Amino acid sequence: MSRLLRRLISPTPPATVQRDTVRLRLEDAEIEVLRVRDPRARRIKLSVDERGARLTLPPRASLVMGERFLEQHRDWLAVQLRQYQGQDLPAALQPGVEGVLPLRGELLPLRWQEGRFARLEIDEHGGCVQWPTRGGDATLRRLLREFYEAQTRADVGRWLPKYLPGLPRAPSRLRLKVMSSQWGSLAPDGSMALDLALVLGSPQAFEYVLVHELCHLIQPNHSPAFWHEVEQRFPAWREQRDYFQREGRRLKAMLRQLL
């Protein structure tokens, strides 16, 4: 049996993540799908975000199995890609060019002023960036990340005291991340992770996610008892869940474009 045939049929599980691309004819165009062999994956998975399509293979899945999975889901893939292409995102920010800054469900006008150090502040006119003459794209991405992290922590700090009574304990730590699909999570040690994209959208939706994760301190599951705890603290949670179904992809796409 040739080496290629062995790889196609029963590849040796890799110790690290491996990436390549596979081309797929889809409707009237040929697209590239990122193929990722991940030792942590348990099943074949096809996903789509603003960067394109991704096929994840577990260690013992063959390339043939992956390509067959792509063929079986080509109609679904075409629909998902059309949805992402139709998203109305603000123009990407460029150093020194006026634009808009997404924050708490609004698009704030953003202006630039010369300064010694990169700094972003909010005032009555919108956002204002103090910008050094040698600032570049990396400086802007770092500035935006620091800004959104500070705004996210400010919101959590404002809401958290209201919900602490009745909880067995406070979260042990707060981590802010760029999450691909989740909005938040609570680890067994009590540390909470939240998606930075939350601060771009509706504050009520963000507050719901915070309450959702806090309730996992009481019920580490999604049982009826868990949803009862959520209902007691945030009765409008269904409306906010619907909001994420409508706007979630757009929020995550905006964050990735910004950072």
Residues covered by each model-derived region:
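Active-site-proximal or metal-binding-adjacent scaffold patches in catalytic folds
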Residues: M1-Y208, L217-L259
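Walker B catalytic acidic pair
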Residues: E213
